[in-house]
Amino acid sequence: MSRHKSKSIPGRNLRLAEQIQKDLAGIIQREIDMTRAGLITLSGVELSADYAHAKVYFTVLGAEPDTAAALLNEKAGWLHSQLYKLLHIHTVPTLRFVHDPQLERGIEMSMLIDRANRGPHSGVPDEPEDQS
């Protein structure tokens, strides 16, 4: 899923955002030791109208989002140089990685729906009670 704001050439913006997302995902998977950062999935790229800046949205499992964001942003310059080698465009955007909480929100919503569907008379407790 690519996010784009630009009205200038929306098709190009969308294609470029998707290509950046695809290429970055491959580079991160092959080239960066992400053991400290958990399992990272790139969920979207939002390009500025002039293509100079890109917000790269990610989700993470198995680690704190702040840890993953710090590691990705620390590697942003190197990732930019790797993208430059792959993309055949004049300006490769600077990268800023931002945690995308959509996955967590989706899980929370699913739990709320399940709880509502169980109803008050289902005999299944909503939350396990703390015995301490």
UniProtKB/Swiss-Prot annotation:
Entry's NCBIfam families?
A: rbfA
- Give Gene Ontology CC terms: cytosol
Q: Name one GO biological process term.
A: maturation of SSU-rRNA
- Kindly provide the name given to this protein in its UniProt entry: Ribosome-binding factor A
Recorded name of the encoding gene: rbfA
Per the UniProt record, which residue ranges are transmembrane? none
Q: Which family does it belong to?
A: Belongs to the RbfA family.
Q: Where in the cell is it found?
A: Cytoplasm
Q: Name one GO molecular function term.
A: ribosomal small subunit binding
Q: Which organism is it from?
A: Bordetella avium (strain 197N)
Q: Does the keyword ATP-binding apply?
A: no
